[in-house]
């Protein structure tokens, strides 16, 4: 997912994070172009996907081993390490785990589903190992006079250690300076990207609005939307969504990541499996938008084929074998069959 929760945070964001986010989008766009150029030869495309999967697994495994090693080293060095240094080490490990989860999210669109689930389990296990370590080490130094506090204090300490995991997902912060529609209430907002060179576009702080976007754009960011209906043409790269409630969103993209969504319906066409985090009451159905020129826009974005991935949702906060209770398929009798919009009204 990727925006901040407060305006003041956006103004003080480390420029390095902005560059990292931009580079991520460039990589996604480059991957898309590579897939398009390879598509005429199915065998070549299959080989490329296999190569990409192998490359990801190698990088993921290296990072996993590094994190496991750092956890083990921190445990061994705890007796000779001062409290402030220990906290710093644990925080760095937490950031490394978050970066590993981000790596998985960025590459999930071409990975086999079993690799995604296996990798999610690994990330979850690493987080649990860090939680246990922080519970064993940090409370001992601060609360050594309570011998039984070791098993109870991790919960009070976890928010500090896990802070990157809470703060980092809303990374829409870097795009606050990008073109967009912001701070509107009860309006119909229309924008056409036809003939435009806009790379990124943001919808932020909208309440009870209807938004119609036609044409293609490289990346789309949605942040703090309430009681809105959003209809968009295809997005070449990714769509990152944070903090939406009581909304209907009709979206097409290669990757869609949803963070903190509540009681909202998503009509999607997406090349990879949609990802939800910290969300509940969200329902999914197939993309149903129509406007003049949409077929050409879908081809331009490499989204002309329906993959049915709209129904294959990954809940990053639900790793059990049973269906996540946080999302469901929108019943057919409740779905909108077709929505027709225009770029000028």
Curated annotation (Swiss-Prot):
The modification N-acetylmethionine is found at residue 1. GO terms for biological process: microtubule cytoskeleton organization; post-chaperonin tubulin folding pathway; tubulin complex assembly. Its main location: cytoplasm. Residues 40-55, 74-83 have a biased composition (Low complexity). Belongs to the PILZ group of genes that disrupt, when mutated, the microtubule cytoskeleton and produce mushroom-shaped ('pilz' in German) embryos. Essential tubulin-folding protein involved in the final step of the tubulin folding pathway. Required for continuous microtubule cytoskeleton organization, mitotic division, cytokinesis, and to couple cell cycle progression to cell division in embryos and endosperms. Not essential for cell viability. Binds probably to the multimeric supercomplex, stimulating GTP hydrolysis by the bound beta-tubulin and the release of the alpha-/beta-tubulin heterodimer. This is Tubulin-folding cofactor C. It comes from Arabidopsis thaliana (Mouse-ear cress). The gene is TFCC.
